[in-house]
Amino acid sequence: MSIECHNAFILHRRPYRETSQLLDLFCQDVGKVSLIFKGGRSGTRMRRGTAQPFTLLQATYFGRGQLKTVKSLEAKTQVVPLVGNRLYMAMYVNELLYRLLQAETACDGLFNTYQDTLISIARDECPQTALRNFELTLLETLGYGVNFEQDIYSGELLECGFEYQYQQQAGFFAKQAIHNKQHIYTGEQIQALSERDFSNPEVLLAAKRFCRQALAHLLGGKPLHSRALFSGAK
């Protein structure tokens, strides 16, 4: 029996039968893994309390199919303290990973970014900056990184002082007649996106708009539950 052990975070959990849970973990070395946690709902208090989101775990599991079996879960850190809107932001990050990651596809750099993002959401004065950085890293990891330097049609360099139109899954091109201004970005905003410089509030808003547009196609037009929770809490 092959046993694996990885650092991991819980992305999603749900009840299974009378005493167990189904878990989706984000593991440092192997990406997203689905497991059954037997007795996870009715075991000892220590066992039940271990399976908490936003806690770095050491996950040991076994199995050959798509659904593995938890052997043990051990908390390596305390739960990242998240309350109010910051909790909804962290739930949003988890939902993106749960929805978009392919099963058992390694993405070490993204794991580190995810861990840093949780800490930034909890502690930073402006957690929106961490969210935008995470979204851009996620797009790159999934193979949908955008060229922020060249016009996708002419090949010319994008310049400050001009406006450009964004085309999903492609990139930017010189602005044409368009009714939806939400897809228009200035050269200055695009350059700041490329450098991940969100110090300008207008750039931070533009980054939020861009990331939402870039992720929309990957999500298949299906709404995010965490986004609805966040909107309802305002």
Regions found by a protein language model. Name each.
Residues M1-Q21, F26-K234:
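Non-catalytic alpha-helical scaffolds and adjoining flexible linkers that form interface surfaces
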